[in-house]
Each structure stands twice: as C-alpha cells, then as structure tokens.
Regions:
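Short, ordered loop/turn segments at secondary-structure junctions
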Residues: 12, 60-61, 82
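Structural motif
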Residues: 8, 34, 58, 78, ...
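Residue-level detector of flexible, active-site-proximal loop/helix-junction positions
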Residues: 38, 62, 84
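Conserved N-terminal catalytic core of the sugar/cofactor nucleotidyltransferase
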Residues: 42-78
Length: 99
C-alpha cells in the first residue's frame, strides 16, 4: 500500500529535493497535498507531474492568480494553512516540512 504524503513548502529547494526522491520511488508513495507561499506556477506544475489534487497557497495574490490560471481543473486550491485541519487528518500518513 502506498504511503500518502503532504509536503509543506514543495517549491523550496528542500521541497524540490523531496519530490525528486519521491519521483524515484513512485510505487511506494502518493502525494496528497502540496503547499507554497507565492510560487503558484511551480506548485501547479508539481501537481500535474505528481497527480496531486490538493494545493495550499498562503499568499492571497498568488492564490487569486492560481485560481484564474487553473480554473476548471480537478484540483482543489486552498488559500491558507487553516485548510490543513480539514485535509491532513483524513488523507495522509506523513507530513514533510520543507518551509
């Protein structure tokens, strides 16, 4: 069974390193959530690459841009860390912090 993972700060250098490790072992891991502060373009590209359905963007301007940029797709984009209370307890085995 795949381990479900959330990566906080996935667009940082540490976050990108974590994604590279997971990419090499996709059969054992499924990413359920990615977060970023302002870098919504990288975040959305990561979501496409790893088939992630839940994203959190903490910067309001970036959140609005991301919603317009990715309108109509099957990805849920949340605007702050409060949404983690809803997503994390139900969906993930591990939370990796790269903030």
């Amino acid at each position: 069974m795949k381990k479900k993972i959330a990566i906080l700060g996935s667009t940082s250098s540490i976050g990108k390193s974590l994604l590279n490790i997971i990419k090499k072992d996709k059969k054992n891991f499924k990413i359920e959530l990615l977060t970023a502060n302002t870098n919504y373009k990288d975040l959305i590209n990561q979501a496409k690459q790893f088939n992630v359905k839940n994203l959190v963007i903490t910067d309001l301007k970036s959140f609005i841009k991301s919603k317009n940029f990715y309108k109509g797709k099957k990805i849920k984009i949340f605007k702050n860390f409060d949404s983690l209370k809803i997503i994390l307890p139900k969906k993930v085995d591990y939370v990796m912090s790269a903030i």
